[in-house]
Every structure is written in structure tokens, then in C-alpha cells.
Amino acid sequence: HDVVRFISAPVTMIGPGWVGSAATHLFLAAPRERRVCLPNTRFLIHQPSGGAGGQATDIAIQAQEIIKARLRIAHEIARETGKPIDEVMADIERDRWLSAEEAVEYGLISRIIERKTELRKAD
């Protein structure tokens, strides 16, 4: 995610059929006008998950890191979609699947394309 924003070359993200979980976070690194998908693409947003093991203190540390990651991801989704943070937090509480059309409405992508020729020259 940070590397996509760090490089100077313009990056266009194209959803090829399925953009889910951590891939959605990477997808949001590109500016909205450079986020597109194909018609049958499905998107999945949700809170992070993880496993923990070891001593109780280690488990508590890992749980806190997952909570921090959840907030960081929610803030990123809110910033990139324009959705209120409370709405995003509710949306990622469980798996939330979106069709290509729903992804446009949600603000994950700018538009749906069917052919490479539909990419703008500026993209």
C-alpha cells in the first residue's frame, strides 16, 4: 500500500474478477479515478483476522495489534471512499461483499470497464 503511494509513476488498479481482504487495502492505494474493475468483479471488505498462541501476555499483544490494524484499515477505507468512519466500522464487522456496481456506489472504484481501450489516456 505505502509503496504504491511512494512511487512517482501513476498507478492504475484494475479489479480482474476478485479483490478481497488485504487486496482491497492495496487497491485503495491508487487514487479513486485510477481504480477500475471488470464487470463481474467482486470486492470483499472485512476486519483483519489472525491467530494467537503462546503465553497470555503474547496473546494480548497480538489481539491489540489486530485491533490497531482494524482501525487503520477502517480509516483508510473511510478516507478513500468518503464514507463516515462509523459506517465503515459497521461494514467491516463481518464480511461485506460488493458487486462491481456496489463498489462504484461505495466509492471503492470510479467505474467499470469491459475493454482495455476504455482506460483513459491519462490512466
State where each predicted segment sits.
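N-terminal organellar transit peptides
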Residues: H1-A22, L28-D123
